[in-house]
UniProtKB/Swiss-Prot annotation:
Gene source species: Herminiimonas arsenicoxydans
GO CC, alphabetical: plasma membrane
Enzyme class: hydrolase
Protein name stated in the entry: Undecaprenyl-diphosphatase
EC number of the protein: 3.6.1.27
One GO BP: regulation of cell shape
Amino acid sequence: MDTILALKVIIMGIVEGLTEFLPISSTGHLILAGSLLEFTGPKVKVFEIAIQTGAMLAVVWEYRVKIAAVLGGLFTERRAQKFAVNIVVAFLPAALLGLVFAGAIKEKLFAPVPVAIAFIVGGFVILWVERRNKQQVHAERVQSVDEMTLLDAFKVGCAQAFALIPGTSRSGASIIGGMMFGLSRKAATEFSFFLAIPTLMGATVYSVYKDRALLSMADIPLFGLGGLAAFFSAFLCVRWLLRYISTHDFTFFAYYRIGFGLFVLLSAHYGWVVWAE
């Protein structure tokens, strides 16, 4: 691996880690970053999905005590069983739809312009949900992930399925969806973190297996370096986001999405930036 390639891999890993758990779309930012860096192609699309494992492991480490308690109580504690079932139920909608539409989505929508449109639409959805929740005094029905019902989990899972569209944001769809359905900001954010574990792992395993013919043993250092960069940047981001949501809403991210999406569309139209496909 030459120095330039290593730098590109590290940058992509950092972008993944910083954006995976914010409601701004990691996939969208990876597509745009890869386009700017001229780091594109079929193998890179697998790389972009695989390095999500690094970000996922950051959540595992941050919530290792909770995860260990759930795993330890799977066969003995009703609370742990309920939580595990909720995660599985929330995971299924995106997993099933992903199996059906992943190929078409990767072929048609993994490009800067569709991503920019999804950025803008998602930004307006966040603004609408934040305004709606402020107007409804009793909007927050669920204060903790342990209070969620099976129906709550299924609704969040259906919301997460919209994130199959690049630029939508997996965390944004699940968090904002959770808030729409009565979860507090903290409960929605934490459930989104936990839901990321099977979702990102499943996406990685599926993508690597499906496109295994494109890969070789020589790619392991590249994937490992990107995953490591994603782990450390995601760990810092998760810690920061948990502090941020205690005193802020997601309005800033909505305006960021809209502004950045408009910039990408205008730059593509007027040729300010050459976005590689």
